[in-house]
Amino acid sequence: MQSTVDVVIVGGGVIGCAIAYYLSKSGVDVAVFDRGEIGAEASSSATGLLAPLGPLSGPGPFADLLLTSFSLFPELVPELEEASGIKLEYEQTGALRIVRNPKQISNLHKRMKAWQPLGLQMHWLTGDEARQQEPLLTPVVCAAIYAPEESQIKASQLVKAFSCAAANYGTTFYSHREITGIQQHNSRVTDVYTAQGESFACNHLVIAAGAWAAHCSKWLKVTVPIIPQRGQILSLHQPLPPLHHIIFGEAAYLTPKSGNMVIVGATKEEAGFEKHLTAGGIAWLLNTAIRLTPALESSPLDQMWTGLRPRTPDNQPILGPAPDWENVTLAVGHGSVGIMLSAITGKTIAELVIKGEVPKIAHPFSLTRFEQPFQA
């Protein structure tokens, strides 16, 4: 006799694993399916920035979502570390957003004014003051915003911790098990099918398939408007003296990491599912990093890699019920902030599944905002 699992989650990245963690912690029977290894795609490629100011232009629903998730990490980190036995390398390093051209100062002022209602600490620095914080910054830096609360975490460790803790609470993980179809009764999914021909009965289906979420459209008959966006990233050995803060400038960032490394990221490219590195992408990263911090010119290269972000048309996630389905929930399209949004997404989707009601914070992120009819 076929057993039935309470919730099947399609996608074993940081979002799927976070949802599994919050559900299983509440006693829900969960199974997570991934087309590859658990956490092997964008979640492990990510830099792990917990820096909410950058994606925001001011207050609003997206700011509420990001800042709420950001505020969960100080308590979530020790909880996850204890439940999983994995250290997350969570650090409140603070971030500097710098400009090198005096003509850009007014725009930086405007950004700071727009961010002030968000409630995060910010300090305006002159170029000299910025170099006091980071002596290796370019001599031509003329102004900066310092946000001391912005933080970072080791992304690959976070997804491992979510998955290990969820497994300890009873979640079953199926790697290399791509879900390729469903069985339905009226407007409910009753079973899911894998590429290997296996069948699993479930009471609820959650789609958290990252850049591959649009592939679910054909069997849900719901348009999920997500495309992959390639990000190229590299790491360098730290210069001397080492960098201590996250540095944002000229559409790139530098992030000091354990092991005496600095991560430089990241390109944003529409390249389909092509994950290869390009000479142009790596050259842009290196040139920008050296413009911001000239001492990096002599730093040995460490590694280079890519990841595929799941991007929606408005660069905000899709959270909530799938239209015309009673027991299908979407948690997709987190773009470049999946690590930062993992906490609130896991908590919110678990609450939705358990209580049957969409939490207020998720209302603005319904798929229905796009109103795209399904095309087979």
What are the roles of these predicted feature ranges?
Residues 64, 98-107, 146-164, 276-280, ...:
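Short beta-strand to alpha-helix junction loop
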Residues 48-129, 133, 288-290:
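Dinucleotide-binding Rossmann-like beta1-alpha1 core, especially the glycine-rich loop
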Residues 15, 38, 212:
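Conserved Rossmann-like nucleotide-cofactor binding loop
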Residues 145-196, 200-204:
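Helical element adjacent to the flavin cofactor pocket in flavoenzyme catalytic cores
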Residues 21-26, 35, 48-50, 54, ...:
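Active-site substrate-recognition segment that forms the wall
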Residues 293-376:
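C-terminal catalytic lobe of FAD-dependent flavoproteins
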Residues 5-31:
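N-terminal Rossmann-like FAD-binding beta1-loop-alpha1 element of flavoenzymes
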